[in-house]
């Protein structure tokens, strides 16, 4: 009899193989976090001994933690994968940043528009993503195989039934799919799977003394000199880690002593808050994640 994690693994591998068989030009969105690391491990397993029959795509906002970028490049080189990095040229030309323009504009330009540009440029018709239903309410109601319009928009009213684990990957010309193989996993499942298979992850997930400032109720790490300090702010060293990773000025750390996977698992069993409480972009407005997804966001 399969264990809980083995059932989740089998489901995810089935989804990947099914979509690859029914699409012409698939891609895996690689955001460098723990979910992407698990999804990549599953992809390596699904198509072994061959490499995954699709490239990795990272939509780079230029504001990721430095350790994330180093981990991205090391992972692609170690596994010999086709990594494609897209940076929105409009964001570069207009100097978009989360401080001057705000998190909503920053996210739209760098992430949403950047992703749509990359998908159009390469002609990808199916994109694997690492979103999970337990993360956030709009992700909870989105299907595993999610249809997107020619403009990459998501319409919740056009979702298809997925009875008996049957996935409809049909689409009209110009439409595309967003596919979420680990949709049914929980944060605890992810960490247990990482420990079971010794999957490499970004060191930022482990507690360490790091320079942070307390801003609007969040602990923001001072990752480089671009972070403007407000009046009275002085970076202080605190033992923190991150439950979720994104652009460093928009990602809050948590106080933690978890320096190992065992420590993190124990912390997960005791926590009563969502991992996305540290993502400042989720607080832009009521229902902001669903609005972003309707506009083409991950």
Swiss-Prot record:
Pathway named in the protein's UniProt entry: Sulfur metabolism; hydrogen sulfide biosynthesis; sulfite from sulfate: step 1/3
Key word RNA-binding present: no
Gene name of the encoded protein: cysD
One Pfam family matching this protein: PAPS_reduct
Keyword presence, Membrane: no
UniProt keyword annotations, A-Z: ATP-binding, Nucleotide-binding, Nucleotidyltransferase, Transferase
Cross-referenced NCBIfam families: CysD, PRK05253.1, PRK12563.1
Name of protein: Sulfate adenylyltransferase subunit 2
Recorded GO MF terms: ATP binding; sulfate adenylyltransferase (ATP) activity
Region: Disordered, residue numbers: 272-298
Subunit details: Heterodimer composed of CysD, the smaller subunit, and CysN.
Skewed-composition ranges (Basic and acidic residues): 272-282, 289-298
Similarity comment: family membership: Belongs to the PAPS reductase family. CysD subfamily.
Catalytic activity, as annotated: sulfate + ATP + H(+) = adenosine 5'-phosphosulfate + diphosphate
Enzyme class: transferase
An individual GO BP term: sulfate assimilation
């Amino acid at each position: 009899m399969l264990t809980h994690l083995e059932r989740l693994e089998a489901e995810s591998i089935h989804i990947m193989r099914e979509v690859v068989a029914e699409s012409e030009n698939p891609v895996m969105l690689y955001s460098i976090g723990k979910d992407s690391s698990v999804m990549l491990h599953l992809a390596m397993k699904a198509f072994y001994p061959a490499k995954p029959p699709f490239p990795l795509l990272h939509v780079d906002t230029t504001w990721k933690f430095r350790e994330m970028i180093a981990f991205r490049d090391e992972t692609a080189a170690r596994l010999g994968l086709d990594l494609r990095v897209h940076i929105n040229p409009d964001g570069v030309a207009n100097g978009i940043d989360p401080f001057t323009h705000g998190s909503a504009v920053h996210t739209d330009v760098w992430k949403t528009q950047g992703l749509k540009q990359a998908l159009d440029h390469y002609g990808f018709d199916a994109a694997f993503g690492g979103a999970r239903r337990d993360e956030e309410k709009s992700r909870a109601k989105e299907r595993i195989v999610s249809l997107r319009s020619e403009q990459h928009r998501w319409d919740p009213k056009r979702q298809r039934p997925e009875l008996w684990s049957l996935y409809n990957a049909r689409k009209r010309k110009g439409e595309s799919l967003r596919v979420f193989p680990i949709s049914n996993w929980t944060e605890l499942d992810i960490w247990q799977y990482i420990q079971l298979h010794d999957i490499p992850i970004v060191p930022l997930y482990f507690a360490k003394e790091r320079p942070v400032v307390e801003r609007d109720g969040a602990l923001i790490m001072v990752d480089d000199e671009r972070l403007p300090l407000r009046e009275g702010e002085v970076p202080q060293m605190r033992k923190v880690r991150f439950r979720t990773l994104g652009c460093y000025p928009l990602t809050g750390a948590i106080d933690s002593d978890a320096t190992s996977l065992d420590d993190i698992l124990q912390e997960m069993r005791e926590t009563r808050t969502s991992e996305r409480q540290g993502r400042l972009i989720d607080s832009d407005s009521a229902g902001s994640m669903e609005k972003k997804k309707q506009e083409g966001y991950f």
